[in-house]
Curated annotation (Swiss-Prot):
Name of this protein: 3-dehydroquinate dehydratase
Biochemical pathway: Metabolic intermediate biosynthesis; chorismate biosynthesis; chorismate from D-erythrose 4-phosphate and phosphoenolpyruvate: step 3/7
Organism superkingdom: Archaea
Record flagged with keyword Nucleotidyltransferase: no
Enzyme class: lyase
Amino acid sequence: MICIPVIDENVSDAINSAKEALKYGDIVEFRVDLLNDVTFEDIEKFSKIPSILTIRAEWEGGAWKKSDNERIELLKYAIKNNAKFIDIELKEERNLELVKYRNEIGSKTKIIVSYHDFEKTPEIDELIDVVEKELKIGDIAKFATFAHSKEDTLKILNLMNKYSGKIIAIGMGESGKLTRILGLDFGSILTFASMEGKASAPGQVDVKKLKEILELIE
């Protein structure tokens, strides 16, 4: 799957951007933390669109400035409305609460548990530990680390291969671009690409260019 982040500041723009993005990608990621304001009704609208709902905490590189309790309640509402995916941080102390809620109500939402390192790619043993912890909590493990070298890129690709079908792994930065291009072949369930001029992370590839490259590889 190709996932395109939606990074607009108001809800109507976000929904319009999502509709346009889905002409090129398979799903979108609504970065709810970047919106100026969001209601439960908005979450319901987003949940009807093939998407990942992410309300990234400020302490994990996001923009969510309101209470953690409000964030958790919005994510629960997404689960209640059977959003395709939600993303919650490994460091979020209440992540198991969301899984328990999903299971109790019989929601179809898949839960992605994520980890970010914006400075480096840790050693492979540390990354394995992260992925194992994530998979004990949610359905899909995700990590995004900053790749500084070919060695970092190889580490990330190796882990995609090891956890094929239950991982999303990303090497941020120029050195990590190969992880975005080869990710699907190595076992990542999706790769992120951006609409022109709307990248949400360093090294994100334009979706039209990515599709051209993937067609050449095939």
